[in-house]
Amino acid sequence: PINLIKSKFDDLSSSSMRQEILKYKDMTIINDCYNASPTSMKSSIDVLSLYSNEKVCILGDMAELGIKSEFYHSEISEYANYKIDKLIAIGKYRQAYCEKFSDKRNCFCFETIEDFEKNVRDILKGTETILIKASRSSRFEKVINILKDKF
């Protein structure tokens, strides 16, 4: 019975863009760009922190947070301290994300995905484990395509 249960778990797959693990060459991508809230951001960072190689968060805006949006975005950067190696923030709240991240040398802010694309090879090596997380409205599947194209 235990082998049957294990085999059923092995057959499970995550929903597209929800904690979806993608292997691409020497890179592992955690595609979690379907939705984002403060709680789900923290949970995803916790998953990323379990990996042994260099850990990178590419984070976009969390939508529909109201007047506390800046606070929640900066809270995520504080939470990520000592759990990840690099933080890449893209979107309206990019500065708030980097506000409390302690390693400023490894915190990168971009207004648009296109700006990130122009700089990606200067920041990443293509061997990292990368969490990609944002609200659906940010269309972060484009980031995955950029990573596949550049590496």
Model-identified regions with their sequence ranges:
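ATP-dependent carboxylate-amine ligase
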Residues: 1-151
